[in-house]
From Swiss-Prot:
Keywords for this protein: Chloroplast, mRNA processing, Plastid, RNA-binding, tRNA processing
Family: Belongs to the intron maturase 2 family. MatK subfamily.
Protein name, per record: Maturase K
MF terms (GO), sorted A to Z: RNA binding
Species of origin: Triticum aestivum
Role of this protein: Usually encoded in the trnK tRNA gene intron. Probably assists in splicing its own and other chloroplast group II introns.
Coiled coil spans: none
Length: 511
């Protein structure tokens, strides 16, 4: 009990910096110039259709909120204010998005500054198992081969809007900000229909990317807080005769096992278990739990996660969202790669004096391949090819100049090769390059009233250079002074780039 209280207090020590003395101070935007609504252009004022807003507009709206009874008049007389005037769609969307994005910026400031102003006496210890997302790549290369079972987790959402607000109460103790958050969430959907309406979730996520990302990260952080605590406790179980599990509000103790107490529900018991080698990796909405334990231990972890989501976060999730597989006999989809750990045989001939014999050695190899069907589906959705992979023209780009068209196709191709450079089999990437090249030729050919073959012959090396230039330059700079490296023969070489996390959604460059 005392151990968990100390662990929880260290987690709560950050929360005092989330108390806002004044919500939306007039010049609060000046403290976060890098978190502007428009990225590198914080003063640009663009229309609502472009989804870009100026920090100046946010400030003006914040000043309006300081006016007396602004929100009260908005609720009592919705037709007198543009924010709630549903008859005027442009102003309704424009002002609501400005307000939601501005709210997200203000909430993000304490999170970004908590390390700078955290007192030394309350400094939170750094755990070795909490590392950067870039540690995913060495984990795959070095440690994945020594594990046996893998649980592929699709982190469920949505959850009820009120649950999102309640989760923030542990970190944000400013009541007006929570009321404003409820106000913004109510604006986009009905409280009762949100949990069943995927359309409302899609609209909210699309129109309020920053706010949705903050709410989702808060939810995932709370879920991982419990997961980390249980993981730390499980490593000490053989030395303990009893244990406790604590719910954040209501605490309970039971010898030799722990119980979870929830108001309105019966007691649910989850037994302690020991898993000596457990690895947890999350990327966006997917996570994996890999271990060297038994299948029974993986089922217990699955049971724990389902009960955690059901009784603490108050929403039901399907057990099929957690897949338990044996690494030697299955593959899994993570970060856009289709990965597996197959076993291969290596025959070694050994000779001792006059006797010779063969040694069959079983070796594990981490294999990553590109999901060809999925990427061709993306290209088909973006109208670069048919569903079967046959290249077609892109008529929507015919109004652009020739070099702009070449640059767009080349950039998409380079992004694909850059992101999937960690693949051990790159033949699929060359097939995608072939599709993009022909699609580019079919787009430019009719524009110049020429056939595809004649147009490709007319462009010659310039056309090919636009698709190969970036690869040759990158690899020549990396390996020219160290070792001989030929990209054209590197179909099985894996090179992980740390900046691929910036282009994680490959649908965006295709649109």
């Amino acid at each position: 009990m005392e151990k968990f209280e100390g662990y929880s207090e260290k987690h709560k020590s950050r929360q005092q910096y989330f108390v806002y003395p004044l919500l939306f101070q007039e010049y609060i935007y000046a403290f976060a110039p890098d978190y502007g609504l428009n990225g590198s252009e914080p003063v640009e004022i663009v229309g609502c259709n472009n989804k870009k807003f100026s920090s100046l507009l946010v400030k003006r709206l914040i000043i309006r909120m300081y006016q007396q009874n602004f929100l009260d008049n908005s609720v009592n007389h919705p037709n007198q204010d543009r924010l709630l005037d549903y008859k005027n769609y442009f102003y309704s969307e424009f002002y609501s998005q400005i307000l939601s994005e501005g709210f997200a910026i203000v909430v993000e400031i304490p999170f970004s500054l908590r390390e700078l102003f955290c007192p030394k006496e309350k400094e939170i210890p750094k755990f070795q198992n909490l590392r950067s997302i870039h540690s995913i790549f060495p984990f795959f290369e070095d440690k994945f081969l020594h594990l046996d079972y893998l649980s592929h987790i699709e982190i469920p959402y949505p959850i009820h809007l009120e649950i999102l607000v309640q989760l923030l109460q542990y970190r944000i103790q400013d009541v007006p900000s929570l009321h404003l958050l409820r106000f913004l969430l109510n604006y986009y959907s009905n409280w009762n229909s949100f949990i069943t309406s995927m359309k409302s979730i899609f609209i909210f996520k699309k129109e309020n990317k920053r706010l949705f990302r903050f709410l989702y990260n808060s939810y995932v952080s709370e879920y991982e807080f419990f997961l980390l605590f249980l993981r730390k406790q499980s490593s000490c179980l053989p030395l303990a005769s009893s244990g406790t599990f604590l719910e954040r509000i209501h605490f309970s103790r039971k010898m030799e096992h722990f119980g979870i107490m929830y108001p309105g529900f019966s007691r649910k018991t989850l037994w302690f278990f020991m898993d000596p080698l457990m690895h947890y990796v999350r990327y966006q909405g997917k996570a994996i739990l890999a271990s060297k334990g038994t299948f029974l231990l993986k089922k217990k972890w699955k049971c724990y996660l389902i009960n955690l989501w059901q009784y603490y976060f108050c929403f039901w999730t399907q057990p099929r969202r957690i897949h338990i597989n044996q690494l030697a006999n299955s593959c899994f989809d993570f970060m856009g790669y289709l990965s597996s750990v197959p076993k291969s045989s290596l025959l070694v001939r050994n000779q001792m004096l006059e006797n010779s014999f063969l040694i069959d050695t079983r070796m594990k190899k981490f294999d990553t391949i590109v999901h060809a069907t999925l990427l061709i589906g993306y290209l088909s959705k973006a109208q670069f090819c048919t569903g079967s992979g046959h290249p077609i023209s892109k008529p929507i780009w015919t109004d652009l100049s020739d070099w702009d068209i070449l640059d767009r196709f080349g950039r998409i191709c380079r992004n694909l090769f850059h992101y999937y450079s960690g693949s051990s089999k790159k033949k699929t990437l060359y097939r995608l390059k072939y599709i993009l090249r022909l699609s580019c030729a079919r787009t430019l050919g009719p524009k110049h009233k020429s056939t595809v073959r004649a147009f490709m012959q007319w462009l010659g090396s310039v056309f090919l250079e636009e698709f190969f230039r970036e690869e040759e330059q990158v690899f020549s700079l990396m390996f020219a002074k160290t070792t001989y490296f030929s990209f054209r023969g590197s179909h099985s070489e894996r090179i992980w780039y740390l900046d691929i996390l910036r282009i994680n959604d490959l649908v965006n460059p295709l649109n």
